[in-house]
């Protein structure tokens, strides 16, 4: 994917969601004729991130399990927001949402991934922010959030 001009950064989120694969791996077990794959995507793609702007980017895991020709795959509806501001501690690694309303293999791996990520965040932080909305708005303000978070949950209000 060809990087765009950084001046177009704010307009990238208006029309469609951009993502690129950061990492992909798979395992195969011949006894059960099963394979398990995991990949991580980043939104926006790494080449779009402008480090001088205090915004977030998202890393989303995609899990795939295939047994006897039947495949389950689930993006987990789980997003980890990581700050591009180097001065912020890793405590601002925020798990926004997790959906477990899918097939059992996805349910199992979703819980496993969430547990590992939670432990990772807890290991490197003195505290986890209580209120995501307040923390995000207080640090980053409306200018950054408007293109990134069209959801009403992330609308920053004055005061």
UniProtKB/Swiss-Prot annotation:
UniProt keywords, alphabetically: Membrane, Transmembrane, Transmembrane helix
GO CC annotation: membrane
Protein's membrane topology: Multi-pass membrane protein
Location (main, coarse): membrane
Transmembrane spans: 22-42, 45-65, 80-100, 104-124
UniProt subcellular location: Membrane
Keyword check for GTP-binding: no
Keyword Membrane set for record: yes
Protein name: Putative uncharacterized transmembrane protein C1235.18
Species annotation: Schizosaccharomyces pombe (strain 972 / ATCC 24843)
